[in-house]
């Protein structure tokens, strides 16, 4: 008696769990299309992984790349993955501007730059990226939700202070959490205004 085994279709239509989808997120959230929307731009001007003919140069040594391997990115939080993608986008975009100038001068200026200025440039968000992200739906929605969360937490803090006291550890912990959200929000708004 022989049993027939049905092959599993490669593209099975099933809903992914919210945990899995939130872990990896949407690719559209990671990359900006601002530089790709320009007509007649060569791939090498946009990304360092390709030469003038559009061939991959992954086998070459990448001096200043900050990419994370897939194995490392599986252990990161979604916010850390997005931050890493933003840094990589800024580095890639910064190199694309240098290709217009003398290539040797850009290499020597990169080599002579201090590590502090390089670290600062990694943390400063790219203006084009943030402008594009601001025009998309998720950023205003995120700000709206963040405002509502802050309002709810402020009311809870007032209740905690009146009920269990100002010096209770839960009151202090909630107050620290609210201050952390405010600092992150102010930092993001500061970079958006520049």
From Swiss-Prot:
GO biological process, one term: spermatogenesis
Keyword Transmembrane helix among UniProt keywords: no
Keyword annotations of the record: Cell membrane, Cell projection, Cilium, Differentiation, Flagellum, Membrane, Spermatogenesis
One term under GO cellular component: cytoplasm
Keyword Kinase: no
Localization terms from the record: Cell projection, Cilium, Flagellum membrane
Annotated membrane topology: Peripheral membrane protein
Effect of a null allele: Mice are normal but males show severe male subfertility. Mutant males display fragmented patterns of CatSper complex stripes in the tails of their sperm, leading to a reduction of calcium ions that pass through the channels to enter the cell. As consequence, the sperm tail is more rigid, preventing it from moving efficiently within the female. Mutant sperm are less able to penetrate the egg than normal sperm.
Tissue expression as described in the entry: Testis-specific. Expressed in adult but not in fetal testis. Not expressed in ovary. Within testis, expression is restricted to spermatids.
Record InterPro entries: CATSPERZ (IPR039019)
Primary localization class, coarse: membrane
Subunit annotation: Component of the CatSper complex or CatSpermasome composed of the core pore-forming members CATSPER1, CATSPER2, CATSPER3 and CATSPER4 as well as auxiliary members CATSPERB, CATSPERG2, CATSPERD, CATSPERE, CATSPERZ, C2CD6/CATSPERT, SLCO6C1, TMEM249, TMEM262 and EFCAB9. HSPA1 may be an additional auxiliary complex member. The core complex members CATSPER1, CATSPER2, CATSPER3 and CATSPER4 form a heterotetrameric channel.
Biological role stated in the UniProt entry: Auxiliary component of the CatSper complex, a complex involved in sperm cell hyperactivation. Sperm cell hyperactivation is needed for sperm motility which is essential late in the preparation of sperm for fertilization. Required for a distribution of the CatSper complex in linear quadrilateral nanodomains along the flagellum, maximizing fertilization inside the mammalian female reproductive tract. Together with EFCAB9, associates with the CatSper channel pore and is required for the two-row structure of each single CatSper channel.
Protein name: Cation channel sperm-associated auxiliary subunit zeta
């Amino acid at each position: 008696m022989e049993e027939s085994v049905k092959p599993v279709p490669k593209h099975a239509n099933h809903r992914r769990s919210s945990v899995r989808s939130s872990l990896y997120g949407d690719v559209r959230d990671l990359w900006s299309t601002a530089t790709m929307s320009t007509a007649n731009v060569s791939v090498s001007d946009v990304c360092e992984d390709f030469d003038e003919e559009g061939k991959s140069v992954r086998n070459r040594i990448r001096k200043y790349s900050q990419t994370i391997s897939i194995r490392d990115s599986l252990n990161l939080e979604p916010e850390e993955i997005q931050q890493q993608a933003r840094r990589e986008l800024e580095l890639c975009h910064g190199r694309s501007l240098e290709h217009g100038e003398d290539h040797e001068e850009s290499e020597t200026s990169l080599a002579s730059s201090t590590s502090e200025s390089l670290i600062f440039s990694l943390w400063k968000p790219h203006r084009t990226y943030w402008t594009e992200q601001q025009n998309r739906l998720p950023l205003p929605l995120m700000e709206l939700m963040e405002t509502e969360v802050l309002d709810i937490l402020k009311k809870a803090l007032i209740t905690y202070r009146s009920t269990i006291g100002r010096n209770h550890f839960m009151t202090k912990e909630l107050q620290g959490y609210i201050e952390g959200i405010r600092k992150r929000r102010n930092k993001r708004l500061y970079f958006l205004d520049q």
